[in-house]
């Protein structure tokens, strides 16, 4: 895990999406963060030890979805499906489908499995699934402020977690979508889809994949106006836990929490949320094949040396 000392930090991103404004300052106590997203290998150990069954593996009930036809009450999850030809980008249902039998053990559906994917990030995890793993591991999910602080790596004013150029000196720094979205990812960055963890350079804290690959759950409820609330105070908010309730005006009846980091499906053609200060959101019972998580735990006294082994790293003081 990476350790951070308590410090003041910038959150938000100008010139992208309204919910990332205004840019504001927060104060975050020191904490430890997993160096990578939780992998299939790690999640499998948890599932075997506890017998835990994820939401995507459970058959929905009529009580949960009283208006749904019985034939639609089938376990599964949401899977990205490339469009056969260029399509307007105003309706994501053109490239997403509900796949029966898709879950973390079968990322693309019943015919897929985890063979050779042990080091890939676990996906198709809903918020409660991620929380269950974190509790078992003696950790928790990061707050949105903690995630952005860690992603910035002790640096302020950057567009990306690594700097201000998307491809410095022509180098790919994260797993994002290359090619014509949503038709074909040409894999110019080395991966035509999801990748194993830690395939790109870590940030200055020794943390991997805080941009791209898979979105990551944060503990905060989502509200598009939350940053406005924080900015009204005259001093930096200390360890902001997020708003007390969820509200998304686009889907006001759904309870959503924050996603961060973007994914292998993010592209400048459609979604640029691999930028370090941008925000995502997701309904709490829903997973997909581009959504995972990592964990944190309290910690102080970071030292200025790197100590990376397995899924841990020591992060220098800012």
Summary of predicted features, one role per range:
Residues 2-10, 15-16, 53, 59-276, ...:
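Functional-site microenvironments in short loops/helix caps that host divalent-cation chemistry
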Residues 25-27, 32, 196-198:
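Generic structural detector for well-ordered beta-strands
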Residues 31, 46-55, 137, 302:
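Short capping motifs at secondary-structure boundaries
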Residues 35-47, 126-132, 148:
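Short, solvent-exposed alpha-helical surface patches in non-cytosolic proteins
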Residues 37-53, 105, 219:
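K/E-rich alpha-helical interaction surfaces of small helical-bundle regulatory domains
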Residues 38, 221-222, 300-301:
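Acidic glycine-/aspartate-rich tracts in secreted/extracellular proteins
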Residues 288-303:
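Short, structured beta-strand segments at or near domain termini in extracellular proteins/domains
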